[in-house]
């Protein structure tokens, strides 16, 4: 297997996968996640894990703009390590030069019992390998930084942190009772979100594979970070299998044809099934190639036909059995309506029914859902 621009790192435990034994260090890792930027400008964030079994995740992307292993979070309180200072570990970012074509970014996560092993590997794998005697060229620039914000796109929010906890339900007595679920709290931040505090049009889009039941999908404004916190509670059906989840935030805006950003799709069978399931939902159309969600609200109010006027008639002589109302004489100005239905009253005089006109309609302008954040793509390892 050819791996281009390989990166290595270490992840022992973190907020998304807490230590299995008591430890004063809340997080212990050189990198917290894998970041990928696609050619269309879409971003994906994959929090790292220390799985019990070898795990390889593949993300299909053509002509990537960049990928890297980043250390998001520079507060000493996250690590509390005076010796190794994980809060000062740099991030590594690969910036391809030119077009690399089709391929995948692969993430390898290797089980480790201590922090001395580099158990994380990321690299680019081209879709087509060269024939014997042919040349392949992949030029790129390697960036080292402790300013992860300089890598992020200002047009999209990003994931500040992913926290994992036991799921619970608040009872009427305010006591939280565990319900057998797992909870994931995903904090989205960034200037584009800070500029829209408590925007009611922002919503979450969540997909999961078939191995999990989503029991809560709750999005709240976070006044501390000036971003949004997404809370997901899930129940895993078969813990011996890994579980895939994806989420991002959307905002309703007027439709702009031809300006629909695509979403990077992890090359996972489970995620493809989840995307197909989302596409089948009413009122939602999802482009399978780009996983882009667009909701149109162009339904106009139904027009009501004008009711015919009722003619004056002698009492007791209305044709109630057939439900036919006699029609009054038409105004002189409407007597020449060519499509009016002719009728006769009891005296044989000819009258005309005015032509029915549809009520005016005022359809709402079409809306679309704009992607506001990078895609959070998380794998819950097997046997967790």
From Swiss-Prot:
Polar residues bias: start-end ranges: 370-384
Gene3D superfamilies: 2.70.98.10, Immunoglobulins
GO BP terms: beta-glucan biosynthetic process
One family name in Pfam for this protein: MdoG
Superkingdom classification of source: Bacteria
Subcellular location, principal: periplasm
Region (Disordered): 276-384
Compartments, as annotated in UniProt: Periplasm
Annotated GO CC locations: outer membrane-bounded periplasmic space
Entry keyword set: Periplasm
Gene Ontology MF terms: carbohydrate binding; catalytic activity
Biased composition (Basic and acidic residues): 294-352
Pathway(s) this gene product operates in, as recorded in its UniProt entry: Glycan metabolism; osmoregulated periplasmic glucan (OPG) biosynthesis
InterPro entries: Gal_mutarotase_sf_dom, GH-type_carb-bd, Glucan_biosyn_MdoG/MdoD, Glucan_biosyn_MdoG_C, Ig-like_fold, Ig_E-set
Protein purpose: Involved in the biosynthesis of osmoregulated periplasmic glucans (OPGs).
Similarity comment text for this entry: Belongs to the OpgD/OpgG family.
Protein name per Swiss-Prot or TrEMBL: Glucans biosynthesis protein G
High-level lineage: Bacteria, Pseudomonadati, Pseudomonadota, Gammaproteobacteria, Pseudomonadales
């Amino acid at each position: 297997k050819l791996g281009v621009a390989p990166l290595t790192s270490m992840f022992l435990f973190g907020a998304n996968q807490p230590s299995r034994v008591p430890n004063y260090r809340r997080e212990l890792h050189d990198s917290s996640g894998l970041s990928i930027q696609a050619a269309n400008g879409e971003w994906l964030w994959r929090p790292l894990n220390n799985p019990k079994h070898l795990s390889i995740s593949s993300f299909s992307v053509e002509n990537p703009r960049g990928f890297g292993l980043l250390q998001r979070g520079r507060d000493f309180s996250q690590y509390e390590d005076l010796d190794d200072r994980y809060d000062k570990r740099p991030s590594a970012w690969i910036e391809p030069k030119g077009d690399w074509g089709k391929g995948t970014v692969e993430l390898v996560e290797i089980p480790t019992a201590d922090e001395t092993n580099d158990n994380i590997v990321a690299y680019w794998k081209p879709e087509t390998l060269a024939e014997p005697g042919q040349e392949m060229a992949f030029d790129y620039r390697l960036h080292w930084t402790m300013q992860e914000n300089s890598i992020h796109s200002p047009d999209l929010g990003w994931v500040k942190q992913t926290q994992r906890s036991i799921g619970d339900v608040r009872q009427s007595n305010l006591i939280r009772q565990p319900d057998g679920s797992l909870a994931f709290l995903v904090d989205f931040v960034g200037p584009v979100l800070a500029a829209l505090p408590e925007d009611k049009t922002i919503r979450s889009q969540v997909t999961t594979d078939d191995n999990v039941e989503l029991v809560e999908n709750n999005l709240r404004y976070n006044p501390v970070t000036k971003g949004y916190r997404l809370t997901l509670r899930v129940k895993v059906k078969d813990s011996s299998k890994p579980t895939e989840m994806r989420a991002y935030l959307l905002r309703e805006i007027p439709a702009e044809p031809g300006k629909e950003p695509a979403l990077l799709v992890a090359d996972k069978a489970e995620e493809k099934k989840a995307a197909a399931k989302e596409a089948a939902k009413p009122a939602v159309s999802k482009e399978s190639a780009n996983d882009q969600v667009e909701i149109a609200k162009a339904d106009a109010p139904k027009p009501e036909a004008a009711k015919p006027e009722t003619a004056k008639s002698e009492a007791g002589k209305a044709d109630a059995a057939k439900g036919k109302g006699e029609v009054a004489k038409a105004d002189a100005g409407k007597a020449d309506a060519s499509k009016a239905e002719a009728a006769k009253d009891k005296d044989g005089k000819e009258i005309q029914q005015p032509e029915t006109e549809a009520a005016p309609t005022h359809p709402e302008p079409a809306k679309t859902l704009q992607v506001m954040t990078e895609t959070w793509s998380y794998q819950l390892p097997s046997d967790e």
